[in-house]
Design a protein with these regions (language model features):
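N-terminal membrane-anchoring alpha-helices
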Residues: 2-41
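Compositionally biased, low-hydrophobicity segments enriched in charged and small polar residues
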Residues: 38, 95-97, 163-168
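Short, solvent-exposed secondary-structure boundary motifs
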Residues: 41-43, 136
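Extended amphipathic secondary-structure runs
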Residues: 43-50, 186-191
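Conserved SAM-binding loop
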Residues: 46-130
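S-adenosyl-L-methionine-dependent methyltransferase catalytic module, highlighting the catalytic core
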Residues: 108-191
């Protein structure tokens, strides 16, 4: 037996652990890409959205609104309170709210306001199969109890994400309006 043969099982264990880490990371990134990018882009292509609330960096075709301007978005509207939008009842035929309700303290109040200004409201939320998003304690304040990303004219059930609220009370809430790769890297503290 050579002196290096004792290290072979350890090397195999290390390599297997590294391979598992790479596989899990790839699966988390893929789920996050499908949840945040692919489904959102498919939804955006369906029609021009009269009101794209909390638009981030996307153009929905109508008014694009957010609490902060993330880039050069056409027809941008700055909103200061997502529970008191500056529009009349039923002002928009089609409202899109993508990956926002999980960030707010009171999703019911925001959804009620979306229903007030929109005749048809589509929301996209992180589904439970997207673990990196659904369980993101740095950004999200609630966990939606759903395996679907898209919900038309209804708010899926959710629970308050208590540990996240504690973390955010200490570190602040981070909201990243970029690609899912950047979002995942920042959430993991790698950027």
């Amino acid at each position: 037996m050579t002196s290096g043969s004792h290290n072979d099982p350890m090397l195999v264990t290390i390599l297997a652990g590294l391979a598992a880490l790479i596989l899990v990371s790839a699966l988390l990134w893929s789920a996050n890409y499908v949840s945040y990018r692919w489904i959102k882009e498919r939804t955006l292509r369906e029609r021009p959205w009269d009101y794209n609330i909390c638009c981030g960096e996307t153009d929905g075709g109508g008014i694009n609104a957010d609490i902060v301007r993330h880039g050069e978005i056409p027809r941008f509207e700055l909103v200061t309170d997502v529970t008191r939008l500056p529009h009349g009842d039923g002002a928009f035929a089609h409202v899109l709210c993508s990956h926002t309700l999980e960030h707010v303290d009171d999703p019911k109040a925001m959804f009620a306001e979306l229903r007030r200004v929109g005749r048809s409201v589509t929301i996209l939320v992180p589904p439970l199969w997207d673990l990196a998003a659904a369980l993101n304690p740095f950004e999200h304040r609630v966990i939606f109890l759903t395996f679907a990303t898209r919900h038309d004219d209804r708010l899926p059930p959710y629970v308050v994400f208590g540990p996240a609220r504690w973390i955010q009370s200490v570190r602040g809430q981070r909201i990243i309006a970029h690609s899912p790769g950047a979002r995942l890297m920042k959430a993991l503290g790698l950027r």
